[in-house]
Protein backbone atom coordinates (compact mmCIF):
# COMPACT_ATOMS: atom_id res chain seq x y z
CA UNK A 1 0.00 0.00 0.00
CA UNK A 2 2.06 2.87 -1.28
CA UNK A 3 1.07 6.48 -0.85
CA UNK A 4 -1.13 5.81 2.18
CA UNK A 5 -4.02 4.44 0.13
CA UNK A 6 -6.40 2.16 1.96
CA UNK A 7 -7.14 -1.04 0.11
CA UNK A 8 -10.08 -3.06 1.27
CA UNK A 9 -9.74 -6.79 0.84
CA UNK A 10 -12.56 -8.98 -0.38
CA UNK A 11 -12.89 -10.41 3.14
CA UNK A 12 -13.20 -6.87 4.55
CA UNK A 13 -15.91 -6.10 2.01
CA UNK A 14 -17.83 -9.27 2.85
CA UNK A 15 -17.56 -8.46 6.57
CA UNK A 16 -18.84 -4.91 5.95
CA UNK A 17 -21.79 -6.21 3.90
CA UNK A 18 -22.61 -8.72 6.66
CA UNK A 19 -22.47 -5.94 9.30
CA UNK A 20 -24.78 -3.63 7.30
CA UNK A 21 -27.19 -6.52 6.66
CA UNK A 22 -27.30 -7.33 10.39
CA UNK A 23 -27.95 -3.69 11.27
CA UNK A 24 -30.86 -3.57 8.81
CA UNK A 25 -32.21 -6.75 10.40
CA UNK A 26 -32.20 -5.15 13.88
CA UNK A 27 -33.36 -1.68 12.86
CA UNK A 28 -37.00 -0.59 12.96
CA UNK A 29 -36.24 2.03 10.35
CA UNK A 30 -33.38 3.57 8.41
CA UNK A 31 -32.50 6.77 6.58
CA UNK A 32 -29.99 7.66 3.91
CA UNK A 33 -28.30 10.99 4.53
CA UNK A 34 -25.79 12.96 2.49
CA UNK A 35 -23.28 14.46 4.88
CA UNK A 36 -20.96 16.09 2.34
CA UNK A 37 -19.66 19.41 3.65
CA UNK A 38 -20.37 18.71 7.31
CA UNK A 39 -17.49 19.39 9.67
CA UNK A 40 -16.10 16.63 11.88
CA UNK A 41 -17.35 18.25 15.11
CA UNK A 42 -20.83 18.56 13.56
CA UNK A 43 -20.81 14.86 12.65
CA UNK A 44 -19.77 14.07 16.23
CA UNK A 45 -22.66 16.20 17.52
CA UNK A 46 -25.09 14.44 15.15
CA UNK A 47 -23.88 11.03 16.31
CA UNK A 48 -24.53 12.05 19.95
CA UNK A 49 -28.07 13.20 19.09
CA UNK A 50 -28.71 9.97 17.22
CA UNK A 51 -27.36 7.84 20.07
CA UNK A 52 -29.79 9.63 22.42
CA UNK A 53 -32.58 8.58 20.01
CA UNK A 54 -31.41 4.92 20.08
CA UNK A 55 -29.95 5.26 16.59
CA UNK A 56 -26.58 5.14 14.92
CA UNK A 57 -25.02 6.57 11.79
CA UNK A 58 -22.70 4.48 9.64
CA UNK A 59 -20.74 5.88 6.73
CA UNK A 60 -20.91 3.31 3.95
CA UNK A 61 -19.59 2.71 0.50
CA UNK A 62 -22.51 2.81 -1.89
CA UNK A 63 -21.55 -0.41 -3.68
CA UNK A 64 -21.30 -2.33 -0.40
CA UNK A 65 -24.59 -0.90 0.87
CA UNK A 66 -26.33 -1.90 -2.36
CA UNK A 67 -25.06 -5.45 -1.94
CA UNK A 68 -26.34 -5.49 1.65
CA UNK A 69 -29.77 -4.35 0.41
CA UNK A 70 -30.13 -7.59 -1.57
CA UNK A 71 -31.24 -9.37 1.63
CA UNK A 72 -33.86 -6.67 2.29
CA UNK A 73 -35.95 -6.08 -0.88
CA UNK A 74 -38.14 -3.34 0.65
CA UNK A 75 -35.03 -1.40 1.66
CA UNK A 76 -33.46 -1.97 -1.74
CA UNK A 77 -36.55 -0.48 -3.40
CA UNK A 78 -36.80 2.44 -0.96
CA UNK A 79 -33.14 3.40 -1.33
CA UNK A 80 -32.68 2.60 -5.04
CA UNK A 81 -32.31 6.23 -6.14
CA UNK A 82 -30.54 7.51 -3.02
CA UNK A 83 -27.22 5.73 -3.29
CA UNK A 84 -25.23 8.38 -5.10
CA UNK A 85 -22.67 10.69 -3.56
CA UNK A 86 -21.37 10.77 0.01
CA UNK A 87 -23.82 8.73 2.06
CA UNK A 88 -24.33 7.44 5.53
CA UNK A 89 -27.05 5.13 6.74
CA UNK A 90 -28.82 6.06 9.95
CA UNK A 91 -30.22 2.97 11.66
CA UNK A 92 -33.12 3.50 14.06
CA UNK A 93 -33.38 0.81 16.73
CA UNK A 94 -35.97 2.57 18.90
CA UNK A 95 -38.72 4.96 17.91
CA UNK A 96 -38.27 5.83 14.25
CA UNK A 97 -39.96 9.21 14.71
CA UNK A 98 -37.34 10.13 17.36
CA UNK A 99 -34.61 9.42 14.81
CA UNK A 100 -36.45 11.43 12.14
CA UNK A 101 -36.81 14.30 14.61
CA UNK A 102 -33.11 14.21 15.54
CA UNK A 103 -32.17 14.29 11.83
CA UNK A 104 -34.69 17.03 10.96
CA UNK A 105 -33.61 19.21 13.91
CA UNK A 106 -29.96 18.78 12.98
CA UNK A 107 -30.69 19.56 9.31
CA UNK A 108 -32.32 22.87 10.38
CA UNK A 109 -29.07 23.92 12.06
CA UNK A 110 -26.69 22.35 9.53
CA UNK A 111 -28.32 22.90 6.16
CA UNK A 112 -25.79 20.85 4.20
CA UNK A 113 -27.15 17.64 5.74
CA UNK A 114 -29.64 16.15 3.32
CA UNK A 115 -32.06 13.45 4.35
CA UNK A 116 -32.43 11.63 1.04
CA UNK A 117 -34.88 8.87 1.90
CA UNK A 118 -36.04 6.56 4.60
CA UNK A 119 -37.76 3.28 5.26
CA UNK A 120 -39.93 2.14 8.15
CA UNK A 121 -41.67 -1.23 8.48
CA UNK A 122 -40.76 -1.97 4.88
CA UNK A 123 -42.43 1.19 3.56
CA UNK A 124 -40.47 3.87 1.73
CA UNK A 125 -40.47 7.34 3.27
CA UNK A 126 -40.13 10.36 1.03
CA UNK A 127 -39.18 13.84 2.23
CA UNK A 128 -42.75 14.83 3.17
CA UNK A 129 -43.32 11.62 5.15
CA UNK A 130 -40.01 12.00 6.98
CA UNK A 131 -40.87 15.60 7.94
CA UNK A 132 -44.32 14.49 9.14
CA UNK A 133 -42.82 11.58 11.09
CA UNK A 134 -40.45 14.02 12.82
CA UNK A 135 -43.44 15.99 14.17
CA UNK A 136 -45.13 13.00 15.81
CA UNK A 137 -44.80 12.56 19.58
CA UNK A 138 -42.90 9.55 20.88
CA UNK A 139 -44.42 6.59 22.73
CA UNK A 140 -43.60 8.02 26.16
CA UNK A 141 -45.16 11.36 25.28
CA UNK A 142 -48.25 9.62 23.87
CA UNK A 143 -48.57 7.52 27.03
CA UNK A 144 -48.34 10.67 29.17
CA UNK A 145 -51.01 12.35 27.04
CA UNK A 146 -53.28 9.31 27.30
CA UNK A 147 -52.75 9.05 31.06
CA UNK A 148 -53.50 12.76 31.45
CA UNK A 149 -56.69 12.34 29.43
CA UNK A 150 -57.78 9.31 31.45
CA UNK A 151 -57.00 10.98 34.78
CA UNK A 152 -58.72 14.17 33.66
CA UNK A 153 -61.82 12.24 32.61
CA UNK A 154 -61.81 10.29 35.88
CA UNK A 155 -61.53 13.41 38.03
CA UNK A 156 -64.24 15.15 35.97
CA UNK A 157 -66.52 12.16 36.54
CA UNK A 158 -65.74 12.23 40.27
CA UNK A 159 -66.59 15.96 40.41
CA UNK A 160 -69.90 15.35 38.60
CA UNK A 161 -70.82 12.51 40.94
CA UNK A 162 -69.92 14.60 44.00
CA UNK A 163 -71.96 17.54 42.71
CA UNK A 164 -74.91 15.24 41.99
CA UNK A 165 -74.64 13.66 45.44
CA UNK A 166 -74.52 17.08 47.10
CA UNK A 167 -77.51 18.24 45.08
CA UNK A 168 -79.49 15.13 45.91
CA UNK A 169 -78.39 15.22 49.52
CA UNK A 170 -79.11 18.95 49.79
CA UNK A 171 -82.50 18.62 48.09
CA UNK A 172 -83.55 15.74 50.34
CA UNK A 173 -82.44 17.58 53.47
CA UNK A 174 -84.36 20.71 52.44
CA UNK A 175 -87.43 18.65 51.67
CA UNK A 176 -87.39 16.96 55.06
CA UNK A 177 -86.93 20.25 56.86
CA UNK A 178 -89.85 21.86 55.04
CA UNK A 179 -92.22 18.98 55.60
CA UNK A 180 -92.47 19.34 59.40
CA UNK A 181 -92.95 23.13 59.15
CA UNK A 182 -95.88 22.85 56.79
UniProtKB/Swiss-Prot annotation:
A single Gene Ontology CC term: ribosome
Pfam assignment, any one: Ribosomal_L10
Lineage: superkingdom: Bacteria
Keywords: Ribonucleoprotein, Ribosomal protein, RNA-binding, rRNA-binding
GO MF annotations, alphabetized: large ribosomal subunit rRNA binding
Biological process according to GO: translation
InterPro entries (alphabetical): Ribosomal_uL10, Ribosomal_uL10-like_sf, Ribosomal_uL10_bac, Ribosomal_uL10_bac_type
Positions of disulphide bridges: none
Family under the similarity heading: Belongs to the universal ribosomal protein uL10 family.
Self-association and partners: Part of the ribosomal stalk of the 50S ribosomal subunit. The N-terminus interacts with L11 and the large rRNA to form the base of the stalk. The C-terminus forms an elongated spine to which L12 dimers bind in a sequential fashion forming a multimeric L10(L12)X complex.
Function description: Forms part of the ribosomal stalk, playing a central role in the interaction of the ribosome with GTP-bound translation factors.
Name of the molecule in the record: Large ribosomal subunit protein uL10
Designated gene of the protein: rplJ
